[in-house]
Design a protein with these regions (language model features):
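Exported/extracytosolic protein signature
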Residues: 1-167
Length: 167
């Protein structure tokens, strides 16, 4: 007889684990109102730099942001410029970062509350669309809380005083 040979034509599939991951940090810098001292108070502007980095091994697309800004009493504030409505949706390749800028001019009532508290959240899609990726901003200069997702807090200077003159 003749030898019979048979080959298997099934391809070998090596799956590469997708690990989508983003990290968001937010830092604040102060622009003091012209002619004022270095104390943080009404009229000064807080400039927020939000940095988002793709720490995973796959591209993250449709990254959108929310931004929560409150005063020390929990009253909701609105950014003066920049923010999620201006930033739109972005995509980041593995290892890629992008900085986004927003600002808030401190109102008297926010200054009187003693602090302005800000947190950004980024949410994006993995390539398969099945794993949403999300991260809450961390203030790298702030107090580290459990999970490293601490808000960016700017404390205002409170100098209450009253002068009474009797004639």
């Amino acid at each position: 007889g003749e030898a019979v040979s048979d080959t298997i034509d099934d391809p070998v599939i090596d799956e590469i684990a997708q690990t989508p991951s983003i990290e968001v940090t937010k830092e604040a810098s102060i622009i003091h109102q012209a002619g004022t001292d270095s104390e943080i108070s009404a009229g000064d502007t807080i400039v927020y730099t939000v940095s988002v980095t793709n720490n995973g091994n796959v591209t993250i697309s449709n990254i959108n942001f929310t931004d929560d800004l409150t005063d020390g009493q929990g009253n909701v504030l609105s950014l003066t410029s920049g923010g999620p409505n201006d930033w739109g949706s972005i995509s980041l390749a593995p290892g890629e970062s992008q900085d986004l800028i927003a600002s808030y001019t401190i109102s008297q009532s926010a200054s009187d509350s003693g602090s302005i508290i800000n947190t950004a959240t980024a949410t994006g899609d993995s390539p398969q669309g099945t794993d949403d990726v999300s991260d809450v901003s961390d203030d790298p200069q702030g107090t580290t809380l459990a999970g490293d997702d601490d808000p960016t807090v700017v404390n205002t200077t409170l100098n209450p005083s009253i002068e009474v003159t009797k004639a």
